[in-house]
C-alpha cells in the first residue's frame, strides 16, 4: 500500500513520529511518500505531490493539516487518516496516543471511509474569464480583510437574487465546515451526511439576515456591490486570492467528495460532546452523557 504523509512541522515530536512510521512501514506493507516540507525530516521515502499515486494518506497535526492533505488528494478516492497532534482535532480520526492502533487499522482496512461533501469555487473577472479555482472541504469565505468597514454582497442562488448582505464577510460552508468558522459566526451545526450548502454572514448589520441552509445541488453566486476596493476570498482558511468590484464568485458542490477515515466508536455526536462541549457547560463536560 502506498501511503502519503502530511505533517505540521511546528510539532516538536514530529521527527520521532516519522521515524516510527518508517520503522513500522515494512511490517504494515506500506510504501511511504512524504510531502515536500517533511521529506528532508524523513530522509527516506518518496516525495508526495498532487500527482503521486497513493492508496491512503496519513496527516499528522490538527484540522488544518488534514485540510491541507485533502487538497493534495485533489478529488481522488483516497481515505485520509488524520492523527491529532493539535489542540482541537475535530476532523481528525484519532489522537496521537491512538496513532499506532489507527495506522494498523488502516493497513488492515478495518475502518469506515466517510465521504465528505466538497465545494468547488471559482473567481470570474470582469471580462467573464475564470482566473482562480479551488476545492474546499470546510468553507469559502469572502471578507473585507483589514478594512474596518462593511461590505455589501449580492447573493444569487441558481440565478435568483435572494438578497443583499451588509456584513464583514460571508461564509459559504459545507456540512463539515459548519462546525468551523461558520459555527463561530452563529451558523447552524449540520451533520456531515446531510449534504447542503450553508450561507452564514459575518457580523451582519441587520437582525433580518440570518444563516441559510441550501440544498447541495444549487449554485451560489456572490458579488461585492459596495465596500473596500479590494476584498479577500479565503478557502479553508489557507489559500485564496484578492477580489475586486466587478468580479464574481461562483460556488457549487464538487463532484468528488473527500474520504475521511472513521474508527469504531468515533461518531459525530461523540466528537461534538468531547471536542465542542455539546450538551454541557464549560467546566461541566464530565456531567454530560
Swiss-Prot record:
Binding site for NAD(+): 63-64, 68, 138-139, 149, 168, 179-184, 238
Lineage summary: Bacteria, Pseudomonadati, Gemmatimonadota, Gemmatimonadia, Gemmatimonadales
Family recorded in the similarity comment: Belongs to the NAD kinase family.
Stored Gene3D superfamilies: Probable inorganic polyphosphate/atp-NAD kinase, domain 1, Probable inorganic polyphosphate/atp-NAD kinase, domain 2
A single MF term (Gene Ontology): NAD binding
Database matches in PANTHER family: NAD KINASE
Gene Ontology cellular component list: cytoplasm
InterPro entries (UniProt xref): ATP-NAD_kinase_N, ATP-NAD_kinase_PpnK-typ_C, NAD/diacylglycerol_kinase_sf, NADK
Lineage top rank: taxon: Bacteria
Keywords: ATP-binding, Cytoplasm, Kinase, NAD, NADP, Nucleotide-binding, Transferase
Gene expressing this chain: nadK
Catalytic EC class: transferase
Protein's name according to its UniProt entry: NAD kinase
SUPFAM superfamilies found in the cross-reference section: NAD kinase/diacylglycerol kinase-like (SSF111331)
Localization terms from the record: Cytoplasm
Function: Involved in the regulation of the intracellular balance of NAD and NADP, and is a key enzyme in the biosynthesis of NADP. Catalyzes specifically the phosphorylation on 2'-hydroxyl of the adenosine moiety of NAD to yield NADP.
Active site: 63 (proton acceptor)
Catalytically driven reaction(s): NAD(+) + ATP = ADP + NADP(+) + H(+)
Primary location class: cytoplasm
Cofactor(s) it depends on: a divalent metal cation
Keyword Metal-binding among UniProt keywords: no
EC number, UniProt record: 2.7.1.23
Any one of the GO BP annotations: NADP biosynthetic process
Amino acid at each position: 500500500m502506498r501511503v502519503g504523509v502530511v505533517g505540521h512541522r511546528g510539532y516538536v515530536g514530529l521527527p520521532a513520529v516519522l521515524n516510527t512510521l518508517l520503522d513500522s512501514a515494512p511490517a504494515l506493507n506500506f510504501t511511504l511518500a512524504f510531502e515536500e516540507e517533511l521529506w528532508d525530516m524523513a530522509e527516506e521515502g518518496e516525495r508526495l505531490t498532487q500527482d503521486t499515486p497513493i492508496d491512503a494518506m496519513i496527516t499528522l497535526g490538527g484540522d488544518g493539516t488534514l485540510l491541507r492533505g485533502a487538497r493534495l488528494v485533489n478529488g481522488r478516492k483516497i481515505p485520509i487518516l488524520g492523527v491529532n497532534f493539535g489542540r482541537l482535532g475535530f476532523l481528525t480520526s484519532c489522537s496521537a496516543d491512538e496513532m499506532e492502533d489507527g495506522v494498523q487499522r488502516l493497513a488492515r482496512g478495518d475502518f469506515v471511509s466517510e465521504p465528505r461533501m466538497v465545494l468547488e469555487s471559482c473567481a470570474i473577472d470582469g471580462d467573464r474569464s475564470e482566473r482562480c479555482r479551488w476545492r474546499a472541504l470546510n468553507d469559502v469565505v469572502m471578507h473585507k480583510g483589514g478594512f474596518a468597514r462593511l461590505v455589501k454582497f449580492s447573493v444569487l442562488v441558481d440565478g435568483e437574487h435572494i438578497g443583499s448582505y451588509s456584513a464583514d464577510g460571508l461564509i459559504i460552508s459545507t456540512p463539515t465546515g459548519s462546525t468551523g468558522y461558520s459555527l463561530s459566526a452563529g451558523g447552524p451545526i449540520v451533520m456531515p451526511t446531510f449534504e447542503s450548502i450553508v450561507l452564514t454572514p459575518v457580523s451582519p448589520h441587520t437582525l433580518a439576515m440570518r444563516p441559510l441552509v441550501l440544498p447541495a445541488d444549487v449554485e451560489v453566486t456572490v458579488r461585492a456591490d459596495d465596500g473596500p476596493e479590494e476584498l479577500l476570498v479565503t478557502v479553508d482558511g489557507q489559500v485564496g486570492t484578492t477580489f475586486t468590484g466587478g468580479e464574481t464568485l461562483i460556488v457549487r458542490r464538487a463532484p468528488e467528495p473527500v474520504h475521511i477515515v472513521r474508527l469504531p466508536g468515533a461518531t459525530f455526536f461523540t466528537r461534538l460532546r468531547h471536542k465542542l462541549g455539546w450538551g454541557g457547560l464549560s467546566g461541566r463536560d464530565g456531567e454530560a452523557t
